[in-house]
């Protein structure tokens, strides 16, 4: 029983740990709900201008989730909401609409992603959406140095940067926000509770109102599990794909069938003319972690698929190198 984890004493300990985790999150939520946050009225102009410039319409699910967020933002207590939805469901647009409420009320918005590649993708999207509307979108990453870094930090500190996109660099002590009203975190499961509260605490140190917090995840989490693991969060689900979007199929295949997977990649790229992405946990091989490394996998796939052009992209590459790929 001990080896299988089924001993009554073990199960009791597990139960008590889960209860303690749940209670601590609920207590944290109750504490945060007593703290003042900026009440952000629904956007009357900016959201309409943003949607008018897009070549598509929002789905019913996007509208429903956007209303849930707007109802939270109207309150003078901090929003804590998790938005779930498959890849392609339109979470980024929902985040953009949420940003409109804060921006129109003259508050800053910070969007944080776990990797530089994902953060840069958001930066390009939000810059394309918001700069034509007269808003300044700033970029901040750990790799920025010298004058570029100082200029970005100065814009954030003075409020000249109304929308700030970045990575963990947004956590750093020397990054000061002038008037932060909304924090958006993508792939929130990549951040711990302590990490996702760090930006809030930055404002508490400045005796400023706590910003609202919106988290997004494409990882399918059953609602009951979300209620257990993220007891401090309200949950919204975008359960509808835009017209023309194919539902995502997720399949787990053991590494023993690696050659089968490579054959499927070959068929998809050559026969069907598609692109394939092979995502690895690490950049280089590690003696401490048993995980696939991007550089080793790239070499392997080049040998296994000589008829294909196999590219490599990772966070340590220079922007020009990534752009070339």
What are these regions, as identified by a protein language model?
Residues 7-11, 39, 55-58, 214, ...:
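Generic alpha-helical structural element
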Residues 1-53:
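Upstream accessory/linker segments immediately N-terminal to the RecA-like ATPase cores of bacterial MutS
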Residues 20, 52-55, 270, 306:
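Generic surface-pattern signal
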Residues 35-84:
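Conserved pre-motif I regulatory segment
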Residues 35, 64-67, 77-325:
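Inter-lobe coupling/hinge segments of SF2-like helicase ATPases
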Residues 21, 25, 49, 53, ...:
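Generic, well-ordered alpha-helical scaffold segments in large soluble proteins
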């Amino acid at each position: 029983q001990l080896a299988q984890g089924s001993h009554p004493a073990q199960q009791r300990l597990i139960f008590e740990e889960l209860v303690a985790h749940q209670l601590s999150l609920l207590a944290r939520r109750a504490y945060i709900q007593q703290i003042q946050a900026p009440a952000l009225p629904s956007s009357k102009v900016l959201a309409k201008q943003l949607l008018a410039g897009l070549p598509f319409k929002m789905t019913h699910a996007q509208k429903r989730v956007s209303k849930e967020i707007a109802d939270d933002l109207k309150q003078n207590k901090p929003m804590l909401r998790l938005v779930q939805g498959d890849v392609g469901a339109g979470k980024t647009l929902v985040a953009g609409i949420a940003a409109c409420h804060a921006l129109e009320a003259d508050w800053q918005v910070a969007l944080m992603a776990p990797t530089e590649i994902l953060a840069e993708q958001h930066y390009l999207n939000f810059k394309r959406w918001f700069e034509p509307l007269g808003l300044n979108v700033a970029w901040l990453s750990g790799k920025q140095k010298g004058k570029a870094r100082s200029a970005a930090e100065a814009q954030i500190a003075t409020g000249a940067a109304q929308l700030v996109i970045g990575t963990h660099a947004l956590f750093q002590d020397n990054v000061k926000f002038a008037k932060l009203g909304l924090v958006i975190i993508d792939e929130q499961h990549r951040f711990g509770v302590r990490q996702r509260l760090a930006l809030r605490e930055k404002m508490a140190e400045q005796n400023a109102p706590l910003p609202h917090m919106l988290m997004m995840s494409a990882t399918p989490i059953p609602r009951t599990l979300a209620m257990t693991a993220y007891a401090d969060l309200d949950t919204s689900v975008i359960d509808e794909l835009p017209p023309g979007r194919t539902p995502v199929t997720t399949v787990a295949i053991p590494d023993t069938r690696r050659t089968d997977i490579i054959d499927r990649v070959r068929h998809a790229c050559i026969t069907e003319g598609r692109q394939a992405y092979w995502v690895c946990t690490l950049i280089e091989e590690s003696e401490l972690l048993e995980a696939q490394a991007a550089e080793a996998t790239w070499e392997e796939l080049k040998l296994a698929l000589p008829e294909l052009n196999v590219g490599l992209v990772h966070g340590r590459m220079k922007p020009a190198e990534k752009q070339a790929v």
